[in-house]
């Protein structure tokens, strides 16, 4: 009888433990359909965080000629609410954002200098930060000014991407926070760490290796900010083109805007956004097929799978509508 009771108790505790584990690995993702300055602040406040110290707001300044990047009037209220600095890094390809001077000129033309200070984080060089997953990249090369910040708001424009399939918060803090050389290192999955030589291997790198390298780099930035305690994630799902904001001639969006989503878990957030896109039944005026094809053809969701595998976050989430 005692043995039976003991086994029963063990079973009960095992079930409780399993349930608790499930709860711990289910992230909350907050969502509003209100794509406005007010909606952005509202979804940010739903996270219940209070950033302290120097706050970096990581966005994409957008390539000249592009039109889908997050506009200053959308992000102004949030950036000023947290007394944030807009941060970016130079790109690895020749163009208007290749040098700091030209990049700042682009930021000015796009209106970002009118709402906040803009810091090109690799303007004075780069630093190396550690990565946990060394399958491909052995370290992460980021803009040296990253060290000047105590907190980061990863504010991404969710959309398609020519190489990654889609770009959300994982891409925004991997390729986005990497210096020019760091971008080359990620794109070549740890083979080349000099942007001038990147083109020798850019198109011969295994696609999954590139995606896995992005996941590893994203994790290193997450861990850099006190193991994720000092970083939050927001995806704005508007202007859902198949092309990235790094394109000077992006395709027009074929589907309707969806909303703004936020979470403390970048894996859950990107997973939720991808599922929202896939849930749209293609129809006239709201055709999700091109973006879905872009994601599938690049095996884009592999970055999410790998990010979960290496412990960056969880694909399990609870979607909380705050409207």
Please tell me what each predicted stretch does.
Residues 2-9:
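Sec-dependent signal peptide recognition
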Residues 1-2, 19, 23, 57:
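Generic cytosolic/nucleocytoplasmic N-terminal low-complexity/intrinsically disordered segments
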Residues 12-26:
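Bacterial Sec-dependent signal peptides at the C-terminal "C-region" and cleavage site
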